[in-house]
């Protein structure tokens, strides 16, 4: 039995996923994570460094790594790539001025070898705000349709209400689960 097959069998038993949550500062990463965990969202501070939370969802154990998005912290993102099964890229859909910067940062991430094959969930957050950019336009600016190295999907959502968050996480778990936990 090959080493990879042994690792897959071990992970299949554990049904554990490592999910990295990234995006520019003020995109709503921490609020989304807290809402998903059913934690209070009334006092959110910018994440300086990272925060790890574990939750059971859809028969999986999800290890959620929420990493700060400030410009000064982005060079440290690479320290969190190892063993990542999925990347959640959070976009502030109301911030037109930084959408191009958001696209550039995502392209850098997708070129990282240690993220190769990781499922990509793009959450267009703050979709409830006036003037928010629709998901098709965001997908176009992020050039998502050209991505061949990762399974991906984009959802509009609202971190404060939790709108479409469960649906998005269900897609992510189904996608990662179909890659990692099917044994031959």
UniProtKB/Swiss-Prot annotation:
One of its GO terms (cellular component) is microtubule cytoskeleton. It comes from the Eukaryota. This is ADP-ribosylation factor-like protein 2. GO terms for molecular function: GTP binding; GTPase activity. Its main location: cytoplasm. It is found in: Cytoplasm; Cell membrane; Cytoplasm, Cytoskeleton, Microtubule organizing center, Centrosome. GTP binds at residues 23-30, 66-70, 125-128. CDD domains: Arl2. Belongs to the small GTPase superfamily. Arf family. Keywords: Cell cycle, Cell division, Cell membrane, Cytoplasm, Cytoskeleton, Developmental protein, GTP-binding, Lipoprotein, Membrane, Myristate, Nucleotide-binding. In the embryo, strongly expressed in migrating hypodermal cells. Shortly before the beginning of elongation, expressed in many developing neurons where it persists throughout adulthood. In the larva, highly expressed in migrating hypodermal cells and the uterus. Also expressed in vulva, spermatheca, sheath cells, distal tips cells and proctoderm of the male tail. A lipid is attached at residue 2 (N-myristoyl glycine).
């Amino acid at each position: 039995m090959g080493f990879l097959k042994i690792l897959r069998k071990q992970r299949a038993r554990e049904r554990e996923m490592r999910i990295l949550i990234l995006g520019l500062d003020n995109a709503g990463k921490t609020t989304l994570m807290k809402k998903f965990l059913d934690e209070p969202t009334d006092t959110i501070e910018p994440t300086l460094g990272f925060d790890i939370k574990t939750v059971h969802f859809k028969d999986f154990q999800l290890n959620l790594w929420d990493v700060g998005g400030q410009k000064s912290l982005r060079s440290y993102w690479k320290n969190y790539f190892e063993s990542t099964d999925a990347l959640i890229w959070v976009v502030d859909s109301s911030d037109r001025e930084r959408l191009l910067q958001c696209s550039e940062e995502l392209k850098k991430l997708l070129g990282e070898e240690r993220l190769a094959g990781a499922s990509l969930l793009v959450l267009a957050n703050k979709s409830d705000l006036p003037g928010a950019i629709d998901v098709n336009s965001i997908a176009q600016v992020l050039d998502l349709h050209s991505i061949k190295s990762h399974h991906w999907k984009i959802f509009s959502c609202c971190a404060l209400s939790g709108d479409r968050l469960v649906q998005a996480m269900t897609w992510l778990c189904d996608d990662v689960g179909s890659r990692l936990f099917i044994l031959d």
